[in-house]
Swiss-Prot record:
Reactions that this protein is recorded to catalyse: N(tele)-phospho-L-histidyl/L-threonyl-[pyruvate, phosphate dikinase] + ADP = N(tele)-phospho-L-histidyl/O-phospho-L-threonyl-[pyruvate, phosphate dikinase] + AMP + H(+); N(tele)-phospho-L-histidyl/O-phospho-L-threonyl-[pyruvate, phosphate dikinase] + phosphate + H(+) = N(tele)-phospho-L-histidyl/L-threonyl-[pyruvate, phosphate dikinase] + diphosphate
Keyword Nucleotide-binding: yes
Transmembrane segments: none
Protein species of origin: Streptococcus agalactiae serotype III (strain NEM316)
EC number: 2.7.11.32, 2.7.4.27
Function: Bifunctional serine/threonine kinase and phosphorylase involved in the regulation of the pyruvate, phosphate dikinase (PPDK) by catalyzing its phosphorylation/dephosphorylation.
NCBIfam families hit by this protein: PRK05339.1
HAMAP family assigned to the protein according to its UniProt record, in alphabetical order: PDRP
Pfam family, one: Kinase-PPPase
rRNA processing among keywords: no
Name of the protein in its database record: Putative pyruvate, phosphate dikinase regulatory protein
Similarity field: Belongs to the pyruvate, phosphate/water dikinase regulatory protein family. PDRP subfamily.
Residues forming coiled coils: none
InterPro entries per UniProt: Kinase-pyrophosphorylase (IPR005177), PPDK_reg (IPR026565)
Length: 276
């Protein structure tokens, strides 16, 4: 229709936030479907704003702008008022109110929320990576990982991988088993990207018995025997020594405590610093 009602979304970033607010508000008017969205992204100068108003001149327009630049937002308000456009400034009053109460000046940088969204998606990617390569499912992931955690069974490899993935670090964990050759990829990367985990024999004996019980198996199985645990522990320590990687004993440590130690080691070694 010629007099179609149009919402102009004017933003110094993508305009997704403003559009989401507009849609939420329009849901209160279910009987009216003549609204049309027109999004103007990355409006960062008065010249570009002028072009938006030129386009609005022949339409019935409601202006919604999300501009962190105070001068630009003020200009948009004045133009709307002088040309009798209905409008709402989504950011100025909120930012000024927060600044007044907190005593902190705003950054005035457009696109910050978008950068935060990018961090979120990177974190999701890291978590998906940890799940995909959990428990050595595909050793080729070693070459793509920021961090490789190695250790025998029940040394908290998986929960640590997930915890660190939430810190935006791509982690793969590799189980060390005497009968299984060490992945060749471990010798193809910087040993500072590898962390070895150990545990006390007594603690491993206890947690493995609990694990067997949860699976409905006998606690006397070889998996939980002291002889087997000693064999695995000696083998793992020899592998870690040959690789020259840092080793952490996780006995009596919470996941968060071990993760903090790992993060400090990575920072000291200059590894994955971009994520920390």
């Amino acid at each position: 229709m010629e007099d179609q009602l149009t919402i102009f979304i004017i933003s110094d970033s993508l305009g997704e936030t403003a559009k989401a607010i507009a849609k939420a508000c329009l849901s209160q008017f279910p009987g009216h479907d003549d609204w049309h969205f027109q999004c103007f992204s990355y409006i960062n100068s008065q010249e570009r704003l002028e072009q938006v108003f030129e386009e609005a001149s022949q339409k019935t327009v409601f202006m919604m702008f999300s501009l962190v630049d105070v001068a630009l937002a003020s200009y948009a308000q004045k133009r709307c008022e002088s040309e009798h456009y209905a409008y709402v400034d989504l950011l100025t009053n909120v930012i000024q109110g927060i600044s007044r109460i907190s005593g902190i000046d705003p950054l005035g940088e457009p696109g910050i929320l978008r950068r935060l969204d990018n961090d979120y998606f990177k974190r999701v990617e890291s978590i998906e990576f940890a799940v995909k390569y959990d428990d050595g499912r595909d050793p080729r992931g070693i070459l793509q990982a920021d961090l490789v955690i190695i250790g025998i069974s029940r040394t908290s490899k998986t929960p640590l991988s997930m915890f660190l993935a939430d810190k935006n670090i791509k982690v793969i964990n590799i189980p060390l088993v005497p009968e299984v050759p060490v992945p060749k990829e471990l010798r193809m990367i910087d040993s500072r990207r590898i962390i070895g985990l150990t545990n006390s024999v007594d603690h491993l004996n206890q947690v493995r018995k609990v694990r067997l019980k949860s699976l409905g198996l006998s606690s006397t199985a070889n998996y939980a025997s002291l002889e087997r645990i000693l064999e695995e522990t000696r083998y793992a320590e020899e592998v870690m020594k040959n690789l020259g990687c840092p080793i952490i004993n996780v006995s009596d440590k919470a996941i968060e405590e071990t993760a903090t130690i790992i993060l400090e080691i990575l920072k000291t070694n200059g590894q994955v610093a971009k994520n920390l």
